[in-house]
């Protein structure tokens, strides 16, 4: 069997190998010989030559099939050719099961559910371990010399030698990892008068190499226009001692109280000392970004925060900064709490209340979709209520960017109760999953419970995530008789298990928006132009005495002290700080307002 680093040919077999939380993608030329095949997998998984491994491939029905003999390997390749699949999906486990038929160490049924775990994907070629990176700086591909930036131009960077190429070019690399590249793989300033399109705008900015040498990550750099006299030029102006005029740090804020906490971050209410403005600060420890957790979702969240900053129904960004141990997002503080807290007080909402909230949510989702963003995490907890009673969506870490009309993605993600059937089936999906989640949320608002409530099941085996997914996929949704015909029909429209028939799911997203606006549940009840201008009076006005009022936040958070734990020097020493280059950001509109105070 030829090495996976050989020249690309149509007959090469793509091996997508999952091992210990990573996906290693490599290529081999048939015929595949069992001993060579196992040696190749051991090398890709960094196991020594005599280490016992168990190898299983996934057939077209999603079932794992062991490969222990040449005959079984040949059968896997034959099935791959018959099915015309693009790749052979393989799982590798260390050791052998104690008895035939028993699972291997680390093997359970969730391992084989498509996308059910977050896998860190690495492409192995010529000794390089390429990983997808958002290279927003103007960096030239080592192979084709074109710039690596923008939609359809995903960058790959070797995690060892930092060589950068387009995804489409990585199999043309002839330089072995560790050799000195002889190419233009450094950030390059554009020629005079020549710009690049960033986010649909002309960018005439220049790029610089890092003072420490090497290739700048560029993953976090902003998309704004840089022109003489622009707000961004002002943001980078300096005072007499050379410090940035608008530099933001933890010293600029007084931490007041914890207002939320999630798996990856906590959110603290804070006062901007100079202006006494109140903000929320989302704090993420850098140490969580290890081999099992990639930084891409933080990059995505920052990018979406920037896009959302001036839209009325989305939480916007004030600034970003970092310390050696943490990342900080300074965002709008929304004092009315979230819909989850509101629902806990009200139990269920009148239809006119649900109509108002869902109308504003529709506009927020359409705004994201029009910018190529799938939200993917709509739930009661992520819908905030401002001081006047309008909603704002927050938490963009689950978003998927760069989705155009007709584009699809396949990552398994979301909050279990809101995950759309197409995700559970392992199908590729688009904006449809957000409209399904809206249907679930509207059901919760008007019925006071989830359409898939499994709490209290007698059989403990039924009270599980897998059983919940089975219900979402198979069980017919029963609409409460207490709801009006209009409400019942719109819930049926959004909760259609077939995304092609689901309300709002048209190839042209504007056609989908019009279908929702013209539905009986909304038609004649909402002036959509006035709604988008926040000129429609909210049905509920939270009693907020001041911007420091925490009445609408759960005491399990607000009773917690906001202090940050002391830094651990040993932990900090293990953090690759270059991964966070360019994370800092200030919103020019916010900062110019503060200058005028």
Curated annotation (Swiss-Prot):
Listed GO MF terms: ATP binding; diacylglycerol-dependent serine/threonine kinase activity; protein domain specific binding; protein serine kinase activity; protein serine/threonine kinase activity; zinc ion binding
A Gene Ontology biological process term: gonadal mesoderm development
Cofactor: Mg(2+)
Localization (cell): Cytoplasm; Cytoplasm, Cytoskeleton
EC number annotated for this UniProt entry: 2.7.11.13
Region annotation Disordered: where it falls in the sequence: 181-238
Binding site for ATP: 259-267, 282
Superkingdom of the organism of origin: Eukaryota
Matching InterPro entries: AGC-kinase_C (IPR000961), C1-like_sf (IPR046349), DAG/PE-bd (IPR020454), Kinase-like_dom_sf (IPR011009), PB1-like (IPR053793), PB1_dom (IPR000270), PE/DAG-bd (IPR002219), PKC (IPR012233)
Keyword Nucleotide-binding: yes
Domain PB1: 12-95
Phorbol-ester/DAG-type zinc-finger residues: 127-177
Record domain AGC-kinase C-terminal: where: 524-595
Alphabetical UniProt keywords: ATP-binding, Cytoplasm, Cytoskeleton, Developmental protein, Differentiation, Fertilization, Gastrulation, Gonadal differentiation, Kinase, Magnesium, Metal-binding, Nucleotide-binding, Phosphoprotein, Serine/threonine-protein kinase, Transferase, Zinc, Zinc-finger
Xref: Pfam families: C1_1 (PF00130), PB1 (PF00564), Pkinase (PF00069), Pkinase_C (PF00433)
PROSITE patterns noted in UniProt: AGC_KINASE_CTER, PB1, PROTEIN_KINASE_ATP, PROTEIN_KINASE_DOM, PROTEIN_KINASE_ST, ZF_DAG_PE_1, ZF_DAG_PE_2
Active-site residues, Swiss-Prot/TrEMBL: 377
Main location, first listed in the record: cytoplasm
Chain's role: Required for the normal progression of embryogenesis and viability of the organism. Plays an indispensable role in establishing embryonic polarity and in recruiting and maintaining par-6 to the periphery, through interaction with par-3. Required for epithelial cell polarity in the distal spermatheca. Phosphorylates serine residues of num-1. Required for the expression of antimicrobial peptide nlp-29 in response in response to fungal infection or physical injury.
Subunit and interaction comment: Interaction with par-3 required for the peripheral localization of par-6 and to form a par-3/par-6/pkc-3 complex, which is activated when cdc-42 interacts with par-6. Binds avidly to the phosphotyrosine interaction domain (PID) of a novel pkc-3 adapter protein num-1, which enables tethering and targeting of pkc-3 to the cell periphery.
Protein name: Protein kinase C-like 3
Organism: Caenorhabditis briggsae
Classification lineage: Eukaryota, Metazoa, Ecdysozoa, Nematoda, Chromadorea
Gene that produces this protein: pkc-3
């Amino acid at each position: 069997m030829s090495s996976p680093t050989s020249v690309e040919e149509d007959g090469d077999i793509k091996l997508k190998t999952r091992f210990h939380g990573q996906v290693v993608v490599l290529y081999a030329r048939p015929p595949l010989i069992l001993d060579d095949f196992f040696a190749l997998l051991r090398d890709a998984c960094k196991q020594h030559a005599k280490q016992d491994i168990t190898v299983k491939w996934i057939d077209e029905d999603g079932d794992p099939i062991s490969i222990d003999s040449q005959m079984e390997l040949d059968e896997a390749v034959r099935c791959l050719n018959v099915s015309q699949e693009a790749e052979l999906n393989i799982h590798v486990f260390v050791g052998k099961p104690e008895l035939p038929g028993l699972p291997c160490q680390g093997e359970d049924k969730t391992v084989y559910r498509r996308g059910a775990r977050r896998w860190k994907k690495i492409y192995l070629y010529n000794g390089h371990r390429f990983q997808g990176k958002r290279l927003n700086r103007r960096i030239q591909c080592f192979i084709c010399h074109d710039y690596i930036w923008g939609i359809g131009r995903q960058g790959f960077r070797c995690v060892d030698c930092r060589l950068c190429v387009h995804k489409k070019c990585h199999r043309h690399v002839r330089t072995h990892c560790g050799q000195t590249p002889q190419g233009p793989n450094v950030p390059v300033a554009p020629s005079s008068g020549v710009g690049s399109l960033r986010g649909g705008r002309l960018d005439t900015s220049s790029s610089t190499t890092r003072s420490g040498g090497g290739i700048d990550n560029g993953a976090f750099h902003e998309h704004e226009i840089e022109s003489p006299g622009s707000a961004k030029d002002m943001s980078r102006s300096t005072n007499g001692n050379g410090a940035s005029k608008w530099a933001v740090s933890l010293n600029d804020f007084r931490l007041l109280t914890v207002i939320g906490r999630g798996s990856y971050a906590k959110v603290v209410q804070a006062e901007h000392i100079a202006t006494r403005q109140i903000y929320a600060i989302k704090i993420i420890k850098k140490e969580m970004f290890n081999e099992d957790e990639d930084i891409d979702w933080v990059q995505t969240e920052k990018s979406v925060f920037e896009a959302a900053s001036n839209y009325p129904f989305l939480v916007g960004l004030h600034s970003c900064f970092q310390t050696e141990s943490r990342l900080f997002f300074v965002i709008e503080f929304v004092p009315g709490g979230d819909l989850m807290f509101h629902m806990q007080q009200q139990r269920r909402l009148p239809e006119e209340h649900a109509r108002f909230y869902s109308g504003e949510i529709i506009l927020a989702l359409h705004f994201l979709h029009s910018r190529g963003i799938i939200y993917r995490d709509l739930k009661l907890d992520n819908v905030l209520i401002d001081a006047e009673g309008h909603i704002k969506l927050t938490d963009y870490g689950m978003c998927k960017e760069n989705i155009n009309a007709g584009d699809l993605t396949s990552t398994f993600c979301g909050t279990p109760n809101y995950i759309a059937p197409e995700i559970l089936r392992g199908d590729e999906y688009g904006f449809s999953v957000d409209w399904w989640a809206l249907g679930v949320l509207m059901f919760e608002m008007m019925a006071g419970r989830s359409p898939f409530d499994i709490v209290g099941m007698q059989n403990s085996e039924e009270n599980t995530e897998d059983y919940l997914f089975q219900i979402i996929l198979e069980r017919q949704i029963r609409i409460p008789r207490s709801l009006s015909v209009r409400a019942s029909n719109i819930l049926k429209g959004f909760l259609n298990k077939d995304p092609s028939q689901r309300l709002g799911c048209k190839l042209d997203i504007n056609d989908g928006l019009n279908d929702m606006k013209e539905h009986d549940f909304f038609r004649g009840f909402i002036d959509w132009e006035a709604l988008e201008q926040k000129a429609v009076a909210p049905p509920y006005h939270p009693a907020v005495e001041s911007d420091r009022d925490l009445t609408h936040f759960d005491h399990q958070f607000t009773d917690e002290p906001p202090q940050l734990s002391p830094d651990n020097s040993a932990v900090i020493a293990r953090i690759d700080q270059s991964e966070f280059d360019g994370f800092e950001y200030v919103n020019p509109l916010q900062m110019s307002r503060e200058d005028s105070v």
